[in-house]
Amino acid sequence: MYGEKAKKVLLHIIRSGGIVAEETLGKDIGMKSNEARKILQQLADEAILRYKTGRVGDKTLHLWILNIDQIEGILIARLKKTREKLLIRLNYEKNNTFLKCPLCGRRYTFDEAFENDFLCPYDGEQLIEYDNSEEIRILEEKIKEITDELSRIGAA
């Protein structure tokens, strides 16, 4: 979802009992404070975390708490959203003919190639037909994996 850095933040939060202070997070995991704060905000935007302030003596702490009770719903929603995007991409791959530049490797739809007289607009090479059956196979496989997982948890 957000890469290795977000994974590092989440694992630290989980290992810390589901709650961390923003003020110490960056130092604890070896990350810049502003970078950690940005990841915390992204995770909060997805409702994976919630924010709360607390006081310790005269200091105000910014606490981030894992939304354990909502994680399943969040993951189901994310899986469905991912499946929908993959279905859109699969439809695009199945309903277009592609050509590829043998020199730079850029890929074009038939319409794009036609507009450029079947020459690569970057280097002038003659475009060749491109077989996207492997992309289609991978997309179908991933869609099936997600659908099977959603069925397994009763959320298809």
Swiss-Prot record:
GO biological process, one term: regulation of DNA-templated transcription
One Pfam family linked to the record: TFIIE_alpha
GO molecular function, one term: DNA binding
PANTHER family linked: GENERAL TRANSCRIPTION FACTOR IIE SUBUNIT 1, TRANSCRIPTION INITIATION FACTOR IIE, ALPHA SUBUNIT
Assembly with partners or alone: Monomer. Interaction with RNA polymerase subunits RpoF and RpoE is necessary for Tfe stimulatory transcription activity. Able to interact with Tbp and RNA polymerase in the absence of DNA promoter. Interacts both with the preinitiation and elongation complexes.
Recorded family membership: Belongs to the TFE family.
UniProt function note: Transcription factor that plays a role in the activation of archaeal genes transcribed by RNA polymerase. Facilitates transcription initiation by enhancing TATA-box recognition by TATA-box-binding protein (Tbp), and transcription factor B (Tfb) and RNA polymerase recruitment. Not absolutely required for transcription in vitro, but particularly important in cases where Tbp or Tfb function is not optimal. It dynamically alters the nucleic acid-binding properties of RNA polymerases by stabilizing the initiation complex and destabilizing elongation complexes.
The name this protein goes by in its record: Transcription factor E
Annotated organism of origin: Staphylothermus marinus (strain ATCC 43588 / DSM 3639 / JCM 9404 / F1)
Lineage, uppermost ranks: Archaea, Thermoproteota, Thermoprotei, Desulfurococcales, Desulfurococcaceae
